[in-house]
């Protein structure tokens, strides 16, 4: 048994050389906090306490191999909730929290039918349902293992979300008032410049699109959204690639959407589209 500071020093020694000081520090804080059930303050004030850390060596070996810390732990935080994640789900990002926050700012607790396309871990659908209990929310994805993870998260948090296996490029969607999606949007040519822990460990199908048709999923979703005339307006909320903001505005307008709003994330990068169709 060693003191917490000894474990911290050993972890830091190996991880700084791989990830750099800042990212190594963030990884250690998340890793130790989860495994030892300690808050960030505990990790400081209890440094000289002896602790039992049976998974330390196995965890460190995975981290040295560039496995994302969230996959080592099997969980990722989103809206302060620890969602189950695995090799079949995209790891939730802070930018997606901003998308959810933007939706909650724009829509009240009035009854809405909402669909989350490419639901992954279910973090968007579940976070929306817990914040807006009156909404009827469906989450769809193309792989059963992904749907299983989303269902596990819904059960964990007591969220009433209907998760369905659906290939959105081939199948229709249930009726909805609001369509939300963080679909694949990274051109495959960008993979070579991305971090190894993303490219090698997160599902390609959740990340990449063909170089020649980077807006593939958005076009299909807008087709589905406008396929049938509704008596009431419908809305879309998308997370997008930072380089395609203007193209997305034009695409939405070409399908008859109005009030198309492009928003930036906290890094001041074009990241979200909110648009309305019909009156």
Where are these regions (language model features)?
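An acidic site on a long C-lobe helix of protein kinase domains
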Residues: 52, 92-95, 217
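S-adenosylmethionine
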Residues: 135-136, 140-279
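Glycine-rich, flexible loop/turn motifs
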Residues: 39-40, 65-69, 74, 79-81, ...
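N-terminal auxiliary segments of SAM/dcSAM-dependent transferases
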Residues: 1-73
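A general structural signal for well-ordered alpha-helical segments in protein cores
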Residues: 8, 28, 56, 66-69, ...
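SAM-dependent Rossmann-like transferase core, predominantly class I methyltransferases
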Residues: 57-133, 137, 143-152, 274
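Short helix-terminating capping/connector loops at secondary-structure junctions
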Residues: 21-22, 109-110, 230-233
């Amino acid at each position: 048994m060693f003191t917490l500071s000894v474990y911290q020093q050993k972890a830091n020694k190996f991880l700084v050389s791989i990830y750099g000081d800042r990212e190594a520090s963030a990884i250690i804080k998340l890793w130790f906090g989860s495994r030892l059930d300690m808050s960030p303050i505990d990790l400081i004030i209890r440094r000289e306490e002896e602790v039992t850390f049976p998974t330390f060596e196995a965890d460190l070996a995975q981290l040295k191999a560039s496995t994302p810390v969230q996959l080592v732990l099997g969980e990722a935080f989103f809206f302060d909730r620890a969602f189950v994640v695995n090799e079949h789900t995209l790891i939730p990002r802070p930018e997606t929290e901003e998308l959810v926050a933007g939706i909650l700012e724009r829509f009240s607790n009035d009854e809405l039918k909402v669909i989350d396309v490419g639901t992954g871990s279910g973090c968007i659908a579940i976070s929306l349902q817990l914040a807006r209990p009156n909404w009827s929310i469906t989450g769809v994805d193309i792989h059963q293992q992904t749907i299983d993870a989303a269902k596990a998260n819904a059960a964990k948090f007591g969220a009433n979300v209907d998760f369905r296996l659906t290939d959105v490029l081939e199948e229709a969607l249930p009726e909805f008032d609001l369509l939300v999606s963080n679909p694949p949007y990274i051109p495959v040519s960008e993979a070579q410049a991305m971090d190894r822990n993303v490219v090698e460990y997160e599902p390609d199908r959740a990340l990449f699109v063909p170089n020649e048709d980077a807006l593939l999923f958005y076009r299909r979703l807008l087709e589905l959204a406008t396929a049938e005339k509704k008596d009431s307006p419908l809305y879309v909320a998308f997370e997008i690639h930072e380089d395609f903001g203007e193209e997305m505005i034009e695409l939405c307008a070409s399908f008859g959407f109005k009030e198309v709003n492009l928003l930036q994330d906290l890094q001041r990068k074009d990241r979200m589209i909110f648009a309305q169709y019909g009156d």
